[in-house]
């Protein structure tokens, strides 16, 4: 058991159920709790987006955390903080708010080409500096600041430059976890140069006229992790396919660790889940059909006895598989199944999928406004979960799915291979396709459908999937050891 006076601050741009952009939000919903159970005192900081409902999540103002000054070189912006507990826990979650940056601009927008869509650059600088200013006003000094993805990539550098002489942050260590190597926060250098001291802007990792936020974080964090061993192996030394990130990770591979994701089995357990239509378990599976009927009704699709229901939950961008899905849809609807697509993101993809669904009103439904309640019902109601994303560091959705007896069909990349046992004649927990093409994807779905109609074999597959242990127990123990080793250095 770790010493209880060890404190860890988790910093992320998304945390479920407050806001979900990607699987990172699901990770953040359970990972801090798992580490707190190892004996660490955990807290979370994230932006207070205008889309977050204060009343629903019981956010309240903290008077002593009002009007915090955030100095952006030639100007000062004020920061206000709200707080609530992470649901089903006592973990304090702090929401950093400034009307200019977060009321209308909303979520951080992933930028790959150096653009500054929705003012990302100034927003992310404000957020990173604001985290450190909030800690000082709060008077809570963490032993470790654990940064997640590019949103928090500036923190390690700030601590080693402008905050290095600040006694409040003496001996504070930083960890950066890479959840998605393709989301790196490529933003224009000129904005950093305008808003940050020269000692910071000169140390940023630059690619031409742009700054790479994730690369900058990877250069300066004390420890690097990602969410599976295989994904770590894919990144190391792979400079060309990782926009250069593999190069810095190769240089720092002694401090780079792949640790598999887990899930909170108290929140994600079909026998106790309060967010689904009817609870069920491996020894009483009839409840799963009730969830399927409820989901179809919610999606506006008819129920037909024996007809399989497949689901897709992705962000509408090429990195999460929207392009492959677009290329595959005609092939998929030719198969005898129904399809529910849950996602949001690129408006062109969104329109395409909605227009496509309109052509098949009894077979395809698209939801762009799904909330946590629908996510649970979807995982319980799907017969299979289709995962067209090319790269998954580990992913969380397939872990949720298998725990609920929903069979994944996924591309064999990254941590997916570590979590899904490919179906063979005798065993398995899911289906993997190895060629990233529409034909291979649709072909594997057809293979899954063939097995679905073999009731005895499908039941065996469902029971094997539900019998797997995806709890945080082992992975939390690995992080416990890494944290303690880092703090001893």
Curated annotation (Swiss-Prot):
Pathway: Glycan biosynthesis; glycogen biosynthesis. SUPFAM superfamilies: UDP-Glycosyltransferase/glycogen phosphorylase (SSF53756). It is an enzyme of class 2 (transferase). Signal peptide: none annotated. Keywords: Glycogen biosynthesis, Glycosyltransferase, Transferase. Coiled coil: none annotated. One of its GO terms (molecular function) is alpha-1,4-glucan glucosyltransferase (UDP-glucose donor) activity. It catalyses: [(1->4)-alpha-D-glucosyl](n) + ADP-alpha-D-glucose = [(1->4)-alpha-D-glucosyl](n+1) + ADP + H(+). ADP-alpha-D-glucose binds at residue 20. It comes from the Bacteria. One of its GO terms (biological process) is glycogen biosynthetic process. Its EC number is 2.4.1.21. Belongs to the glycosyltransferase 1 family. Bacterial/plant glycogen synthase subfamily. Synthesizes alpha-1,4-glucan chains using ADP-glucose. This is Glycogen synthase. It comes from Chlorobium limicola (strain DSM 245 / NBRC 103803 / 6330).
């Amino acid at each position: 058991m770790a010493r209880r006076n060890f404190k860890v601050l988790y910093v992320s741009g998304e945390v479920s159920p407050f806001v979900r952009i990607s699987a990172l939000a699901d990770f953040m919903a359970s990972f801090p709790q798992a580490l707190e159970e190892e004996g660490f005192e955990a807290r979370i900081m994230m932006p207070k987006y205008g889309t977050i409902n204060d009343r629903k999540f019981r956010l309240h103002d903290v008077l002593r955390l009002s009007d915090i000054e955030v100095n952006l070189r030639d100007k000062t912006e004020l920061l206000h903080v709200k707080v609530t507990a992470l649901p089903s826990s006592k973990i304090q979650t702090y929401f950093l708010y400034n009307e200019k940056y977060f009321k209308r601009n909303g979520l951080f927008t992933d930028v790959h080409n150096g653009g500054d869509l929705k003012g990302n650059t100034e927003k992310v600088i404000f957020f990173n500096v604001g985290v450190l200013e909030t800690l000082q006003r709060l008077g809570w000094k963490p032993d470790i600041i654990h940064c997640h993805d590019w949103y928090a990539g500036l923190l390690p550098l700030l601590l080693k430059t402008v905050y290095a002489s600040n006694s409040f942050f003496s001996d504070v260590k930083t960890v950066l976890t890479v959840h998605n190597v393709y989301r790196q926060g490529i933003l224009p250098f000129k904005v950093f140069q305008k808003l940050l001291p020269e000692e910071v802007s000169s140390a940023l990792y630059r690619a031409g006229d742009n700054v790479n936020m994730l690369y900058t974080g990877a250069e300066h964090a004390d420890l690097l992790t990602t969410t599976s061993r295989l994904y770590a192996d894919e990144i190391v030394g792979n400079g060309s396919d990782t926009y250069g990130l593999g190069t810095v990770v190769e240089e720092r591979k002694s401090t780079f660790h792949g640790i598999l994701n887990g899930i909170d089995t108290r929140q994600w357990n079909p026998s106790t889940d309060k967010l689904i239509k009817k609870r069920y378990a491996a020894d009483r599976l009839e409840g799963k059909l009730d969830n399927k009927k409820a989901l179809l009704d919610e999606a506006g699709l008819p129920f037909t006895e024996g007809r399989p229901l497949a689901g897709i939950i992705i962000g509408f961008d090429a990195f999460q598989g929207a392009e492959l899905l677009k290329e595959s849809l005609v092939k998929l609807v030719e198969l005898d199944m129904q399809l529910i697509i849950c996602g949001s993101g690129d408006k062109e993809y969104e329109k395409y999928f909605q227009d496509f669904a309109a052509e098949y009103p009894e077979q395809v439904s698209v939801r762009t406004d799904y909330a946590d309640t629908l996510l649970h019902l979807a995982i319980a109601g799907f017969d299979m979960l289709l995962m067209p994303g090319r790269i998954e560091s580990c992913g969380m959705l397939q872990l949720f799915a298998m725990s609920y007896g929903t069979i994944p069909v996924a591309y064999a990349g990254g941590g997916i291979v570590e979590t899904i046992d490919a179906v063979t004649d005798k065993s398995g927990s899911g289906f993997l396709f190895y060629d990233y093409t529409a034909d291979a994807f649709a072909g594997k779905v057809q293979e899954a459908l063939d097995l679905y109609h073999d009731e005895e074999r499908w039941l065996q597959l469902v029971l094997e999937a539900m019998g797997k242990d995806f709890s945080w127990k082992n992975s939390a123990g690995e992080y416990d050891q890494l944290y303690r080793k880092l703090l001893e250095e």
